[in-house]
Amino acid sequence: GRNLLVTILQSRQSVADISAWSDAVSHIVETFLPLTQEFQIGNAINRSKWGCHNTTDYLRLLETLPDLKARYPGIVLAGSSVIDFEPLATLRTLFNGHQFDLDACCALLYVNRRGSPFSKQYGLFDLRRKLRLIATLASLSKRCASRLWITETNWPLLDTKPYTPNSGHPRSTVDEKTQAAYLSDYYRIAWQSGCVERVYWWQL
């Protein structure tokens, strides 16, 4: 068997009705507890189409976690849930005055728009440096344990429009051989960094 990580998605309604969000999260946890104790709270929280218009919206959702952990001892909660490399959003989710406690920092760390994992963003950050920065933030945070999970990454395939997230733009889509090479590089870099506990190739 394999450990399952269940991602609990938010919507704009979650932010508008915190009580309903809390009830929904509890229901999801209760439903899946026979199968797993691991849950990711929120998804792509720095993209408004997923319901959070800013990090404050997400932090309000996280403030429901203490009650959840009290009711279900032993559950493992991962959060931050920032997609792509946006360190200011990650910083805000990990350093704040809100009251919650995460067992792992999760990041949906796509680098496909750069091409290879060795390519740099902002002239400085290749994948290795991105991982080290996020891991360092998690290690210094009082809201999160020093564990880094990459809970989504991928290189969308050429000629799969309209099913690819970026509608098949050739700048950030690749053929299967290149995808396999880039994913191998990604996993190798993550392993060699010594700061990543797990990497998930996309989500179901």
Region spans (language model):
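Substrate-binding cleft of secreted/luminal carbohydrate-active enzymes
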Residues: 36-38, 147, 151-155, 168-204
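Glycine-centered secondary-structure boundary/capping sites
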Residues: 1, 97-99, 142, 173, ...
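Hydrophobic faces of well-ordered beta-strands that scaffold small-molecule active sites
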Residues: 2-8, 37-41, 77-80, 103-107, ...
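Active-site cleft segment of glycoside hydrolase catalytic domains centered on the general acid/base Glu
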Residues: 12-133, 160-186
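Polar/charged alpha-helical tracts
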Residues: 60-63, 70-74, 139, 155, ...
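Glycoside hydrolase catalytic-domain groove-lining segments
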Residues: 113-164, 196-204
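A structural signal for the main folded, soluble domain(s) of proteins
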Residues: 8-10, 88-95, 146-148, 203
